[in-house]
Amino acid sequence: MSRRCELTAKGPQVGHKVSHSNIKSKRRFLPNLCNVTLMSETLGQSVRLRVSTNALKSVDHNGGLDAFLLKANIANLSPKAADLKRQIEKKKLAAAS
């Protein structure tokens, strides 16, 4: 399982650990990932995703998973989230017509 957020594509970064004597050694900064179950109101089902805490705040700020996915760039989404976005768009289009 990769250490990458399924909604925002945040992944590990590389940097330095700096000691008191200013000696630098390589280290990895890992994203704060959580396994969460989010509810899709359009589809009427819950979806289990591995997302960063930053993405959780963004989902809440945008008004839910459906609104976040509709605004999100499909290139940043995981295949699972991209498929979910397509399903939501298809369902909204069918409801509109």
From Swiss-Prot:
Gene3D superfamilies: Ribosomal protein L28/L24. One of its GO terms (cellular component) is cytosolic large ribosomal subunit. One of its GO terms (molecular function) is structural constituent of ribosome. SUPFAM superfamilies: L28p-like. Keywords: Ribonucleoprotein, Ribosomal protein. The keyword Ribonucleoprotein applies. Belongs to the bacterial ribosomal protein bL28 family. This is Large ribosomal subunit protein bL28. The gene is rpmB.
